[in-house]
Amino acid sequence: LRSLVGSEMCIRDSTGTLSGSCNAAQLAAEEYQAEHPEAKVFVLDSLSAGPELVLLAEHIRDLLAEGMAFDDVCEEMLRYRRHTHLLFSLESLANLARNGRVKPAVAAVARMLNIRVIGKASDVGELDVLCKTRGEHGALERIVLELKGHGYTSGKVIIAHCGNPAAAERLMHMVKAVFEGAQVRVTECGGLCSYYAELGGLMVGFEDADA
């Protein structure tokens, strides 16, 4: 951090409601600015995770590359965050249950009945269950419907998978078939997201029409 004295820093992190990273970042920013009052630090609670964080990071990068002023970057990121979203499809809820995110009984029933859970990151950064489906095809079709329902038209989509590249590729082609000009790419879930998404899980970050 000594090399950043006097610098302007933008920090984005996983949702503060499910991760301690946001609180840690806020505390670090306050401590740093107390020691270096000339520095500017902006901590953005993503209210999300995984591929939606990638969209936010790329937008910050593009704004800085354009030479936008720091305060304007902060304002624009708060606006942009309102127009990015996260959907997910989970084959297992075991790890979410272990960490108190869902009830163990719900996770057990989902496993026995081969139920996939479709959900989203809410406006306050919590995990909301939208519906439950049987089988992978039904889950992918539902994600496409949810994209449309959440205002997606043709912007960026990032599909992150946990050991399920075939489903991710299939979803990518479905999105491109339904939404002309869709900008879709596939990647893998990172460490923490892989833990919660579990094997077979998908996370979909996307921009709505007003992004």
Description of each model-found segment:
Residues 1-11:
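Single conserved hydrophobic/aromatic residue that forms the stacking wall/gate
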Residues 14-18:
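Short glycine-rich anion-binding loops that position phosphate/pyrophosphate groups of nucleotides
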Residues 21, 25-31, 39-42, 48-211:
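Mixed-charge interfacial surface used for oligomerization/domain docking
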Residues 34:
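Arginine/glycine-rich "motif VI" loop of SF2 helicases in the C-terminal RecA-like domain
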